Structure formats: C-alpha cells, structure tokens
Amino acid sequence: MVLSANDKTNVKNVFTKIGGHAEEYGAETLERMFTTYPPTKTYFPHFDLHHGSAQIKAHGKKVVGALIEAVNHIDDIAGALSKLSDLHAQKLRVDPVNFKLLGQCFLVVVAIHHPSVLTPEVHASLDKFLCAVGNVLTAKYR
C-alpha cells in the first residue's frame, strides 16, 4: 500500500494529537478489540483483561508507541518495525487478521476522541497507513 505525500501529511497531523495519549488510546483500542472480537483474547491468557487493567494500559502504550515509531519513519515502516514483525511472526505467531481488527478499533478510538479531525480524506489516509503497518507486521509470516 503506497502512501501519497498527502496521506503522509494527514497521518502525521493525526498523530500530533495522539502522541500524548498513547496509554489511554492504546488501552481503549485493546479493550474494544477484546470486547468486539473475543477470540483475540487468546493471545493474552496471562493478562488481566478487565477495564483499567495495568497490563492492558502498558500493552496499549506499546501498541501506540509502535504506531508512533512507524509514523516517525513513515518512508521506511518496514525498517522501523522489523524487530516487531519478527516477534509477531516467529515467536508470538499472532494470526495476521488480528492486525486489521486492531486497526479498525484504533480508527474508532481516533473518531471518538477527535471527530473533527477524522474527515473522510483523513480517515482514508489513516486506514491506508494502518494497512501498511499490518502488511509490514505480517510480511515475515511468508
């Protein structure tokens, strides 16, 4: 998925609003994913999955931190997320469809917290970006 210059600008603008809320938005994204798609919980048998859980907050912060890293290296997402791709493909063996589900939940969280920012054009750019991240994270499964 190729991001245009306009897509990159849109994504960077959205993430200027998200950066300071990594833990909050990440936890909310994970909680939405676990509630909406219960099979995704199977990858977290050791987590307390209740609302407000310290483990959910910490992992949510890591998830959004990885997205921020991808934004900071938007011209080389594969390089920026290479180690994370290895981890998910070789050690954790996460079903690749879960990255799409997580991306959908993240879009909902952005829409809830920043409705005026998520215009149709920005929504499309952010979706393309999240698909690009998902593609990078699943590339080493092949």
Swiss-Prot record:
GO cellular component: blood microparticle; haptoglobin-hemoglobin complex; hemoglobin complex
Residues in Globin domain copies: 2-142
GO BP field: hydrogen peroxide catabolic process
GO MF terms, alphabetically ordered: haptoglobin binding; heme binding; iron ion binding; organic acid binding; oxygen binding; oxygen carrier activity; peroxidase activity
Expression (tissue specificity): Red blood cells.
Binding positions (heme b): 88
Keyword Transit peptide: no
Pfam families referenced in this protein's UniProt entry, alphabetically: Globin
Keyword vocabulary terms for this entry: Heme, Iron, Metal-binding, Oxygen transport, Transport
Annotated positions binding O2: 59
Functional summary from the UniProt entry: Involved in oxygen transport from the lung to the various peripheral tissues.
PANTHER family: HEMOGLOBIN FAMILY MEMBER, HEMOGLOBIN SUBUNIT ALPHA
Subunit structure: Heterotetramer of two alpha chains and two beta chains.
Homology family: Belongs to the globin family.
Name recorded for this polypeptide: Hemoglobin subunit alpha-A
Native organism: Accipiter gentilis (Northern goshawk)
Gene responsible for this protein: HBAA
